Regions:
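Hydrophobic core segments within long, regular secondary-structure runs in both alpha-
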Residues: 1, 41, 45-48, 58-72, ...
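C-terminal transactivation domains of fungal Zn(2)-Cys(6)
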Residues: 114-120, 124, 128-159, 170-171, ...
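Single, functionally critical "micro-switch" positions that shape active/binding sites
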Residues: 34, 52, 169
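Aromatic- and histidine-enriched alpha-helix N-cap/loop-to-helix transition segments
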Residues: 31-42, 59-63, 117-128, 185-188, ...
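Well-ordered alpha-helical scaffold segments within catalytic/enzyme domains
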Residues: 24-26, 39-56, 70, 122-143, ...
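Extended glycan-interaction surfaces of carbohydrate-active proteins
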Residues: 1-30, 77-118, 155-245
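Short secondary-structure capping/junction motifs at helix and strand boundaries
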Residues: 48-62, 76-83
């Protein structure tokens, strides 16, 4: 459905209730999020680790497989191995990662990136989702499935490191834009690459140094965008504010 952006296997972005819910994004349910689907697979494995009921987890494995299938069939729009987003209509969200404000994805100069956009953290989520599904496969007696997903994760990580690392700056690009140009701003998204494990071991120390620098660390949290970037504004929604989940 192009209005709600629903696709097979895709996890919804939000559910709105109330008399005017359909007036916002075309309906009470909206699927325009590029990150919710791999995060669902990660969450299922995390629930299993914390002792979720075996039968419930087993019953959700087909949904996890459908989510991973969405990533390759619909999320990867141009077969380059990365998950990208671009809204299907002029009613949807322009940006569909967690920084979903219209100006949330921009270059170091402040220029706004044009979609389709492949976010660094979303590639990390997909990497972690593949490993999560491999872990579940091992737990439920599916060794061949586990090997397949681990191989896919390793291939994604290699592609990511080749395409996103900016050696002259010492951080990963925030994203790749419509022309596959690295969006070179220094942002908190970088930290998600550490969390998911997609970052290379040899990059970890310099990334930690960048994130703990004065331009990123406000003293009470990480800024969403470094003070040295062209679009920095401490009062903005995603271009300098501090979000607790970061």
């Amino acid at each position: 459905d192009p209005v709600t952006e629903e696709q097979p296997g895709r996890i919804m972005h939000e559910l709105r209730r109330g008399p005017f819910s359909a007036a916002v994004l075309g309906g009470p349910v909206y699927y325009g999020a590029v990150d919710a689907t791999p995060l669902f697979v990660m969450l299922l494995a995390e629930a299993w680790r914390w002792g979720a009921d075996e039968n419930i987890v087993r019953s959700l494995l087909p949904a996890a497989d459908a989510a991973l299938d969405w990533a390759s069939r619909y999320g990867d729009r141009d077969d380059d191995g990365f998950i990208e987003y671009q809204r299907a209509t002029d009613r949807g969200l322009v940006n569909q990662g967690w920084k979903d404000s219209f100006d949330g994805i921009n270059f170091a100069s402040g220029r706004i990136a044009e979609p389709p956009i492949a976010l660094c953290e979303v590639q990390g989520y997909q990497y972690a989702a593949l490993l999560a599904r491999a872990e579940l496969a091992e737990a439920f007696g599916q060794p061949a499935t586990a090997r397949r997903h681990r191989d896919r994760a390793a291939a994604l990580r290699k592609r990511f490191l080749d395409a996103f690392w900016l050696p002259d700056k010492g951080w990963y690009a925030l994203a790749l834009d419509a022309d596959k140009r690295p969006v070179d701003s220094l942002t908190s998204n970088l930290g998600h690459c550490l969390w998911t494990g997609i970052a290379a071991d040899e990059h970890v120390a310099v990334i930690v140094e960048r994130l703990s620098s004065e331009e990123m660390d406000s003293g009470f949290g990480l800024r969403t965008l470094a003070t040295s970037m062209g679009a920095y504004n401490p009062m903005s929604y995603h271009n300098g504010s501090v979000w607790p989940h970061d």
